[in-house]
Amino acid sequence: MFNLFKQTKVAPRVVAGDEVVELPFFDDTLLLQTFVLHSMFVFDQALDVLKLQDALERLGQRAGWRKLAARLRRNAAGQLEFHIPTEFSSQRPAIAQTHIHHETPLSQHPVSAFLPKPSAQPAIVGNAEDLRPLYEGLNCPTKLDDYLYEDRSVVGLHVVSFHDATVLTLNWIHAAFDATAKKAILDAWNLVMLGREDQIPTPVSYREDALKDLGTNPLSPHALADRKTSTLGMIRWALSNVTDLFFRSQETRIICVPAGFVENLHAVAMKELVSFPPGPGEERPFVSEGDILTAWVARLAVSHLSQYPDRTVAIQNAFSARKVLRQYLPADQPYIANCAFFFNVLVPVKDVLGRPLSYTAWQIRRAIKQQTTAEQTEAYCALLRSSGQSKLPPFFGDSSMHMLSFSNWTKIDFFGLDFSAAALKGAGPVRPKYIQNVQTPYKFTEMFPIVGKDEQGNYWLSGTRTTQNWDIIEQALREESPMTGST
């Protein structure tokens, strides 16, 4: 009886003339529907806010790019749909935008004290949530309902401007697109500001599901099919991790890893790999800086598990499958949707902690070569299709595993973004000095996005885990050798 007077939410009326489009199969998943992403870029120059806003609005109204202006609705069957305006006005713009202006330098704002700065040694340099006053504007979306019950575009822009700095935050529902698509949007936005709209590519059409056949006819089983965790196994895993998943507070902290540190780790690893004989049909062992950085973070993350040497560490890594799916996605057209899947590495704790970093990095590189082909992507997506209505990704390992999730955006090069076209004064490139990403309303525990390398070559990454587990990383970092990364 306590809900008798509770107000029922009502979705905005359907606007006649809006183009109604079904969500693509791989976008319409439980996980992607749940999360709103907030991607913040800090520039140490004053930018023309009106130019920024106008350019993004024009992009959202542009033919082929109007998905950015889409509104989310449920149809009579309860399925999500994009309702894409065909006409725009000041009352119904393409892009939801907010702006806060401060008549001071950034250094005089209280939150500036929390802005992470590069470090001489690998270190935790900040907490992402401390910057909430910068990345969340008035009426900022934080959950799916904020899109369903308001006439809000799936993409939003929040700008905080100072005399000497500008903070831009793109927010969007993850069901709209992934990190690779975000970079395509940033590049197109920049071309509008540069007056080079004729160079903006036309995206793959949002009117049809370009990946509708992906995973429907795999030619081979997945490489880890025999290690796929059953539904019962995942229930057992969830129950054994219920405290961390649902009761302990999760924190998203920022880690800076100096350029020289990663370069040294990589050089040592390449020397060590000479002693690793390649497998049948394999080339001479090689690892990238990304491989060794992922291995290094994984070792930090499980440094407290030495008493469980045989426990499986499941390292799942997101990758964009666009390049290997050319039968579905043309190379000259950006795909403004989700096309990121996972490759997986399963190694025991004793190997992650007891063997050289190069060993774990090599396992990651082998998994990339083995599991990110077109054939294996088809097999992975076939498993995803078989997971039921929620379309949860397949998990590999066992019910007692420690799962770590990574996503490396270094090749996307967000730090290479040049917004000099919007600079109010000065010449030369205007690149972000700091970038972070936050997800709401929930946080995935043990998730580590690698944002990329700044102009000085420093790697920036964030991690979401419990406060207790961050204490473990703090301790492990204090014990790190400054040259080799060994403990």
Curated annotation (Swiss-Prot):
The keyword Cell inner membrane does not apply. Pathway: Secondary metabolite biosynthesis; terpenoid biosynthesis. It comes from Aspergillus novofumigatus (strain IBT 16806). Belongs to the plant acyltransferase family. The active site is at H174 (proton acceptor), D418 (proton acceptor). The lineage of its organism: Eukaryota, Fungi, Dikarya, Ascomycota, Pezizomycotina. Its EC number is 2.3.1.-. This is Acetyltransferase nsrL. Disruption phenotype: Impairs the production of neosartorin and accumulates deacetylneosartorin and novofumigatin A.
